[in-house]
Amino acid sequence: MLIKYGETNVTDRLLDYKMSVSFADCRMIGNVPSIELTMKFDNYDGILDNIDISKYWEVKENDASDTRYFKVYDQPEKYTKELTLKMYDNNYSLDTAYDTKLSYPVTIKDQLDEIESLTGLSIIREGIPQYVLDKSVSWYDNTIVIRNYLGWIAELFAANVYAEGIDSIRFVPIEKTAFATTQDLTDYEKNEVYTLTRVYAENGLNPLSKGDETGNTLFIDSTNLYADEQSIIDSIYDRLKGLTFNQVKNVTMISIDNLLPGALVNYNSNEFTFFVSDLTVNYKGGQFSMSTVDGSVTTKNEEKTVKRVSNTTRIRKLQVQQDQESLKLDIIAKEQEGINDKMAQLSLSNEKISLRVTEVEEKAGEAIKQAQGSVKKFVCEYASSTDGVTPPETGWSETAPT
């Protein structure tokens, strides 16, 4: 074990070490996990008092493990002779709004270039397919954090995003082969077998899928607006089809070097293979550390948690055009909150029925006004159109025609 604070080696002061990292919402791909590291030090002489939170901590668990870098983002409430510090890797800093200044449409490569300049982190492009980098993007939401954007991009080629080195992040695709083999499980709960046979994306009126339902379905995050082409779903399926492992809980084992969520581990010469979605490493001295693993993935079509930043002014833009047989959908939505300027429009025609949706904002008291909050509701009205395309000027009713 090697631990350095700046250039100061504090390894001999270590009393307790706990590293934890997990995937959100039990999802297999599209994750941007941040490693949380909690360490307790002997601070008898106050050498760690008033730490500089701008400095990186360098951690290397053993000679065979990668060197990882962490920062303390908040000063301890108080400094004591036994000092506990909580720190995170660079992915933690990605929870900031993607305040893009690009003129849309752009490509994903353009967005990654801008994210590099906004975060100061280098995005390693090795392994990102060219069709992903070249994909055109015509939408943005500047209240959604950069971490979500990177996760959505990673999902396009069955990858996750990890911090690497002192100032980089890397996209790492899921592999169907085991990352490591071990015989050192001291406890485990083995559950059902997961076999991927289908990939499915909701995508509004036009669901996209590849494969069949003989096994398990990988559901693409329904909030991922990048995942809008059949070719993307085909590519994810081709990469992951046949992926098989046992879901597990409460695995206790001797730690495996450089293991992170997203990897497969083979136990006892192919007795079974399990997926790592949640990992905790504890070290209290001695020759090795111990790990606790959970390996569950979702089998339901559930929305991924989207983290937003609350700004005084929010700007959202969305443009969607879709044509599926007789269905025609054109959506143009813009909204600015905090400056009293709003616009929303939705037009849908299917044969002779048109749907008009208008947005109504109601102020709910002085407290809400001060918080610049609002309550929104949608009123749906129907009318018969003579040509099935042009919405009529009159005859609108909240009752659907029979």
Show where each model-derived region lies.
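Acidic, low-complexity/disordered segments
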Residues: M1-E7, Y79-M87, K101, R170-N224, ...
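Assembly/oligomerization scaffold segments
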Residues: M1-L102, Y140, W152-A158, G165, ...
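A broad structural signal for short, well-ordered beta-strand segments within beta-sheet-rich domains
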Residues: T11-F23, V132-Y140, L185-E189, V276, ...
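Short amphipathic alpha-helical segments
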Residues: R13, T107, Q111, V145, ...
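Alpha-helix C-terminal capping segments
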Residues: V59-E61, I115-E116, G262-S269
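Charged- and aromatic-enriched interaction segments used to assemble
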Residues: P76-Y194, T217, Y226
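C-terminal, beta-rich DNA-binding module of retroviral/retroelements integrases
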Residues: N224-V248
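Surface-exposed receptor/substrate recognition regions of extracellular proteins
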Residues: F272-F275, D323-T402
